[in-house]
Amino acid sequence: MSNKIISLGSIEIANDKPFVLFGGMNVLESRDLAMQIAETYAEVTQKLGIPYVFKASFDKANRSSVNSYRGPGMEEGLKIFEEIKSTFNLPLITDVHEVHQCAPVAEVVDVIQLPAFLARQTDLVVAMAKTGAIINVKKPQFLAPHEMRHIITKFNEAGNDEIMLCERGSSFGYNNLVVDMLGMDEMKQTGYPVIFDATHALQRPGGRSDSAGGRRAQATELARSGMALGLAGLFIEAHPDPDNAKCDGPCALPLHQLENYLTQMKAIDDLVKSFEPIDTSK
């Protein structure tokens, strides 16, 4: 098995390369907050030498409650993304939920994300593939790791091979997620880059009745475990005031802890990838 390398400007994304950080905020709350968070991430990752892609959503279309904040929408969101990109010289990742969003989003954003709940929607997959953008596929909470090959095939047959696979936890009974570390290793066997979403894996879906709960206190432990597998990337969201974030605050890393957190993740990644592989199947 060979590791596929995805090139994003000067950044190389592969399971045997130094990890790439996909990070930012859950949803765009305001232009000023987005700029603040992007600046912090940019400064910290540059200091630590971590390749970095800014993440935020312009629309959270799958909130638990119809009254929950969704975001500024695509038009305003893309304006904010353009400003972040030009100000900080950062590549961008965001998610789409509908076919008509794919082409305009791909004109601004470098990586388009396929949400976990929509990962089997063929029309959306085809529309995303045809943009030619790099694709980040969130593994649905209800699919086994080996079933991700079917989604890969859909993208391939639609003409796109620039695919990353993202683990974000699996359903474990009601209102709970667990992370199958061996499942991430199984996804690595496809050769495609595997990303670990250590933020959303902390969710307790519907755990607060009309919104998701989370286990922010365990953010470090979960991410350390994932990084020990030798992955292509880490996906995290942070907020300067998680308790008052408009979406997924219970899972968000406090922004002031970002540097210490990433320092540990980089140390683990560097160590694990310095080891010679051991084939215990023989």
UniProtKB/Swiss-Prot annotation:
Chief location: cytoplasm
Keywords in alphabetical order: Cytoplasm, Lipopolysaccharide biosynthesis, Transferase
Subcellular locations according to the entry: Cytoplasm
GO molecular function: 3-deoxy-8-phosphooctulonate synthase activity
Known pathway: Carbohydrate biosynthesis; 3-deoxy-D-manno-octulosonate biosynthesis; 3-deoxy-D-manno-octulosonate from D-ribulose 5-phosphate: step 2/3; Bacterial outer membrane biogenesis; lipopolysaccharide biosynthesis
Pfam family of the protein (one): DAHP_synth_1
KW tRNA-binding (keyword) present: no
GO biological process, one term: keto-3-deoxy-D-manno-octulosonic acid biosynthetic process
This protein's GO CC annotations: cytoplasm
EC number: 2.5.1.55
Catalytic activity: D-arabinose 5-phosphate + phosphoenolpyruvate + H2O = 3-deoxy-alpha-D-manno-2-octulosonate-8-phosphate + phosphate
Stated family: Belongs to the KdsA family.
HAMAP family for the chain: KDO8P_synth
Record's protein name: 2-dehydro-3-deoxyphosphooctonate aldolase
UniProt organism field: Shewanella pealeana (strain ATCC 700345 / ANG-SQ1)
